[in-house]
């Protein structure tokens, strides 16, 4: 069986202050973030590749090698209007491409830190797309927002106005609206986080993300024009890989598995999501907060089996 773990590290591709800060933190911790993934791949007998925005990927085999791959340039030129977000659309495109080369593939965002010796490919059924999904109701909003809604101090729309387009609840609403556009009932607020995605070649091929990308862009455009939700909500909708990914799971009733939190622990960096010694027990830690120094302090004293 040929197994691959891959990640993507791109130099700054957005002028947004928020994104620039995150790219800078990734660059600062680059060596350790890469080494953690190399070490994990070696432990479980998988190849590891790191893709860059120089149309190169680094193959960390017995002898580190640099290889040309123009997938990024081709994809970026086609979807250049989406700036930072084209990177997240691209990673799913690349997942599908690599699944044609390997039996099993695991994608890890650069800010995901493996913290286990256990083999992801053996732990879960690779016949299913393995990804963590969160039921992104208003219960996922920061506690102070939830309290305002429950107390009636602020309306739901007042709270929405204080969020941004990357909020999970907002993205779940976008997915629901797109499904409604296609006359598909959606009773939940489930939304995948694509920081960790795995599966075998056949499972990943069922997604057909790249094949359906133009379709999804058109559905999104129609959805925004229909304005099923309030304008303040609809204005947040944009081409997001997680929205599109879960839209396809629901629309096509695909076979997928919801990874347990132990294998995809997300840290957002809010007051409700502090890094603590509890993090030692998690197998994969996704630091959206980019608070790497805090995590290193804890993991340096951890011996995980």
Give the label of every model feature segment.
Residues 1-90, 97-101, 236-238, 288-292, ...:
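N-terminal anchoring/stem segment of glycosyltransferases
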Residues 5-6, 47-52, 106-109, 130-132, ...:
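A structural signal for short, well-ordered beta-strand segments and their strand-loop junctions
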Residues 13-15, 57-61, 114-117, 122-123, ...:
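Short catalytic/ligand-binding loop motif for oxyanion handling, primarily in non-cytosolic enzymes
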Residues 16-21, 60-82, 139-183, 220-231:
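Charged, glycine/proline-rich intrinsically disordered loops and linkers
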Residues 45, 102, 127, 194, ...:
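Short, well-ordered alpha-helix to beta-strand connector turns
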Residues 82-156:
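GT-A fold catalytic core of metal-dependent nucleotide-sugar glycosyltransferases
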Residues 168-296:
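Catalytic core and acceptor-binding pocket of nucleotide-sugar-dependent glycosyltransferases
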Residues 296-305:
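C-terminal active-site "lid" helix and adjoining low-complexity regulatory extension at the edge
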